[in-house]
């Protein structure tokens, strides 16, 4: 299958042949959901914690004598049933990350690429290079191309001027090809790949 290559001015400059096994799959939502959940779980800080009965600042002395009061027997005032006591089974500092097979992760990325192409939301641009880091010029180019909410994926290195010019445009993200991931692809309506990025993806999944 062939993909059209455009310039930032919107002109067509050729076609790029890509494999069906990377860009032509039928997307599976269950795989995409698994990969996104895996990514977001790894991103969670897991620093939540509440004070248990051993953490609260309160006396550990027996509240009142065992017998003779007619009341239920109690020991520590730190017990969770009392006001000011510790939390029972509260959150603790932990990692929320879980494992996901490498093949499933790779498959999820291919499904995400295929889903964008199937929805006509994948565009290939010859290169992400500008002479000056001028945001106004790129905003004009993006509006012509319909990039109002897009993820841009460059080659192994992203042009510094281009990166600076896009940094303060809302709803536009730019990443090098090493940073491509399912979550960022799906959270933006358009996926814009440089020609170099497509070649790297083809080589990776060959």
UniProtKB/Swiss-Prot annotation:
Coiled coil: none annotated. InterPro entries: Ribosomal_uL4 (IPR002136), Ribosomal_uL4-like (IPR013005), Ribosomal_uL4_dom_sf (IPR023574). One of its GO terms (biological process) is translation. GO terms for molecular function: rRNA binding; structural constituent of ribosome. The keyword RNA-binding applies. Residues 42-54 have a biased composition (Polar residues). Belongs to the universal ribosomal protein uL4 family. This is Large ribosomal subunit protein uL4. It comes from Bartonella henselae (strain ATCC 49882 / DSM 28221 / CCUG 30454 / Houston 1) (Rochalimaea henselae).
